[in-house]
């Protein structure tokens, strides 16, 4: 796997063309990826020698089950229906399912890095059972940085309230009188629920737009040309990216009530 | 079971239910004949409120207006879940969800009710209460009740006729006592008679009734 | 002359177009539901003990097999993938209960062929075809308005048989069919080798070998739970759909009256959305139980854990790994030869 092969005028390695003649300049992608991986390194930092220190067992279970739902949706159900409307996101149902399930995982786990982990597990699984590892590891970087990054960033602020029309307000430190003081610290802070409908709408819009823009903006703008060596016109890139913002907003708002209902039922 | 409920079609032959060919029935007519309560209530709850769940069944059975209102009120009073009407069925406890799933089927007033392991996941007291309730409804409405169960005590207590399904065919049929008598076949079928039956047999009255004795205080 | 008038008569053109659009997917649905059924789908993921070489191999060797086959398939021309696919299918002979497995795996692979080749033959982006083949031939042209569906549209003037020169035609291309077959061969080689691993290895052994290869146990656990939950999700989907059918839902609108027909169709869409939410709830409801079960068995309690049954590389494994490395090197060499590289993948 680790060898370079000269192919035409490009260097091709594991199916990657390393074409840097892209619409989004490579350094933007580099900075964005480095920033996001730093966030993941922080979110998945070990605690007491265990990686993913913040995550509880049930978080992994939620992520695994949602990855299984994604696999079933994308590889067993989607192929049964003709893919109509690939140009815009509005009627492209594979993306609708992905939006719903990735946002659901982020909502149920509610920790930064949860969207990234879901997308990572899903990509790994789909490589194993369907696509093959050609073009890796760049597809991993593409999927993680474009589908999950903004949701994970937003989760730093929203945390467990993501996709709930509430926000937590610290009432101040609940007196930690116990002299032993073993498990005090931040969990002992009393939080009060404040209604925040506007934040709920921002949650929905942000999630929908992030996932809707992944393909037209990030893939057409950089990863597709970079890995496959093909090219797109800047006008197509710009028009589909802008169109996908609208589609993403609509999709986010449509799936939001369902995610809210499921989160309420399960927690 | 699925064949009977019209979910699958038989590969050949046909099924006659009250002189209707089940394969030719439309969905609307089928719900009025047969109700099927699934093992896990989560498998059959779809709406965001209990009322919506009952209305969903009635809509499919083409019952509208006052009639629908009346039926909903009757069934929830009957099952004692009238205070749950505006709640989400998914948020209820296991026992309550079970009652809602039974209500969602009974509201269409089917003539045959199929129950797939109706007391799975319920404690002893709860399952006795539920079975008594279902039996009362059965007697009052004159329904036929078909129940799938591994619980031999329930077979002994509640059924008029028992069928032993083994290896895809009906291995034996008869009244429950006759099934329990066939003791040499039990290891093969994987069943063991309830203790009540063993006791009555050991005191020398093998076919003594083991039916649940119900006292009507009225 | 006559043929062109028949083929491109507006009404006939629309009929042929719609048949081409829907024939492939309908055939796929038929294959999956009539020949396999959901039950068969689920048996794909059930492990049955066996005694042949393939069961005695180290799981890591089989994981490596899957990775190397998919990698080589991804970087080389389609007929190399086809050869590897045949070779992997030959290994299926070593599985126990082979008939049952082929009864499920073959229609699945066939469905994958028809589905992908059919879709790509009309939906492959023109820019891809131009890059790969440098020349695109349109076999049949659809009404121009269908370009909005994302059907292949050429830019420029093309000669179309029986019609003459057309500018910016929309339709079925010969290169699209070839392209579809190429990426299908790649996909089926990957699917077949992945299924071989799942068929011949108990899930706990896969987890152990992932952990031994240095993957954090959290990732291995999540990955394996996801794989083993796939049949559960399929089963849940089937049961939920059946319970809707038992309550009298007809998934095909029946009415002849157009207004009623639309109302019925909207109702069906609403029911399907309700069913999807139910499937998600039914699946995720188990999460707490699974988490408790994992915690009780001391998941994540110790960094290094030992196992009662250790897995070790044997002689067969070393031979197999040597062969796989030869395959990989050969694959990389071949992919560099002119005209032997792979075509890009269109998701």
Regions found by a protein language model. Give the residues of each.
Chain C
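Hydrophobic, aromatic-rich alpha-helical transmembrane segments
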Residues: 11, 15, 56-60, 98-105, ...
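Structural signal for the C-terminal ends of transmembrane alpha-helices
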Residues: 91-99, 200-201
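Hydrophobic transmembrane alpha-helices of multi-pass, membrane-embedded glycosylation machinery
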Residues: 85-93, 109-110
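Short, aromatic-rich membrane-interface segments at the entry and exit
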Residues: 77-85, 101-106
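Helix-loop junctions at the membrane-solvent interface of multi-pass transporters
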Residues: 75-76, 94-95, 122-126, 337
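Transmembrane alpha-helix interface motif
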Residues: 1-57, 61, 65-78, 86-90, ...
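Juxtamembrane/interface alpha-helical elements of multi-pass membrane proteins
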Residues: 105-262
